[in-house]
Amino acid sequence: MRLDLFKEQVAEAGKPLQPTGERSYFGLSGFHTCQRNLYYKAKGTPRKPIESRVYRIFQQGHDIEDQTIGLLKQVPNILIEEVDPETGRQFEVQFYGGHIKGHFDFRCRSEYYFGETTRKLGEIKSANDKNFKMYEKKGVQQTNETYYAQVQCYMHGTQNNEHWKDHALTQCLFIVFNKNTAELYIEMIDYNKAEAEHYLECFKNALQAPELPEKYSDNPTFYICRFCDFAEYCHKDKSIELEKIKQCKHIQPNMTSGNWFCTKTDCEFYKQQVGGLTEKCQSISQ
């Protein structure tokens, strides 16, 4: 009997059969309170390979989202839209020429429950029982600023936008699914222009910063640093291999076209992708 081998194989199961590839944009779901964390993400800094266990957690989140959408569709007197009727794809907002993008879960409308016919943005998250109780006690903004920033930027992306026209979204129906008890926490979050612009400014600074920002903390055991994907670069001074154009400290975004350009040499995007960076360029860790 090879039960131990079977356990090992099961533990490693769950990764996609095909690599999903790196996003060509910075997702709004990647907001972080540390500006250096945002900088590393914006520059495409390599992270640790994702474990199979983590992939399974991601898949569980997708399953919970589907389950919750199914529940919402069973509720009378409310319209649930999962895709943009104009594109046939998931609802999307973007900023700075497409360098920053976000996709939200659904859009809904119900005069019966919400007292008006205007559409609401919808976002679904899941949490363990401990964190779920925090949402109940303190609300989304104080419990998870990343999620709060995410939906504020989503709503901001629908304002004064030709694609959205008369359908700008100024409220978000935020739903948290308790993974332990299957309870639901529901909160209506109002759009706040000033806060959304603040969060987007953080993203913009990360894209355009010519130098590595200061650390959030010099203490590697500080909770924000301890669980950071880039702790090994920040606190252990691991060098960054110059594999992609965005990992060069001289690269800057074109905030209109969504492309990148080099501020130090005349190197071109495809040449850097194929042949590697020139010797004149430096790692963002230097």
Positions of predicted regions on the chain:
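Metal-dependent nuclease catalytic regions and adjoining charged, substrate-binding loops involved
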Residues: M134, Q141-N144, Y148, C153, ...
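Metal-dependent nuclease catalytic cores that hydrolyze phosphodiester bonds in DNA/RNA
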Residues: M1-L121, N128-K130, Q286
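Structured loops at beta-to-helix junctions and adjacent beta-edge loops in soluble globular domains
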Residues: F31, K41-A42, K125, F177, ...
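A short mid-domain helix/strand-loop element embedded in enzyme catalytic domains
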Residues: L121-N128, V176-N180
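Short beta-strand-loop-alpha-helix junction that forms the active-site gateway
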Residues: I124-Q141
